[in-house]
UniProtKB/Swiss-Prot annotation:
It is a lipid-anchor; GPI-anchor. It comes from Candida albicans (strain SC5314 / ATCC MYA-2876) (Yeast). GO terms for biological process: adhesion of symbiont to host; cell adhesion involved in single-species biofilm formation; filamentous growth; filamentous growth of a population of unicellular organisms; fungal-type cell wall organization; negative regulation of filamentous growth of a population of unicellular organisms. Residues 1-19 form the signal peptide. Belongs to the KRE1 family. InterPro entries: Kre1. The chain crosses the membrane at residues 110-130. A lipid is attached at N100 (GPI-anchor amidated asparagine). This is Predicted GPI-anchored protein 1.
Length: 132
């Protein structure tokens, strides 16, 4: 009888872990955005003690314009006080490449097919402790 209760508790715990680990942050799979996660260190005060923890920081970048949008811009001049410029031209920017050297591990690492396993385990433990 105790073994059955143990199996039920473990099954519920694992279900919570899987549910918490795969939340997809509400993003669409077919969107044109790309999610990039960076691990950052955050220093805070907890209970009067200084604590430094790592946490995931992510940004999403989307395309801000297309070539078709640029064709519809009318030519002309624009100014603000002593500042002036032209409208309708396509401005090019130099490209900066950022490398991945010496970065913290990202959540792209998959353990047994489960992303963010650590987050799911911690969330499951908090959930179980909350039920007690």
């Amino acid at each position: 009888m105790n073994f059955n209760k143990f199996l039920i508790i473990i099954s519920c715990y694992l279900a919570c872990v899987f549910a918490l680990a795969n939340q997809n942050d509400g993003g669409d799979d077919d969107s044109k955005t790309k999610k990039t996660t960076t691990w950052v260190w955050v220093t805070t005060t907890i209970g009067g003690q200084l604590a430094t923890i790592s946490t995931a920081y992510s940004q999403k970048f989307i395309s801000t314009h297309s070539s078709e949008d640029a064709k519809s811009v009318a030519s002309g001049e624009i100014g603000l006080g002593s500042l002036s410029g032209s409208v309708g031209g396509i401005k090019t920017y130099s490209q900066t490449t950022i490398t991945n050297a010496n970065i913290a591990p990202s959540n792209n690492n998959v353990f047994l097919g489960i992303e963010s396993l650590y987050t799911g385990i911690v969330g499951g433990i908090v959930l179980i402790l909350g039920l007690l």
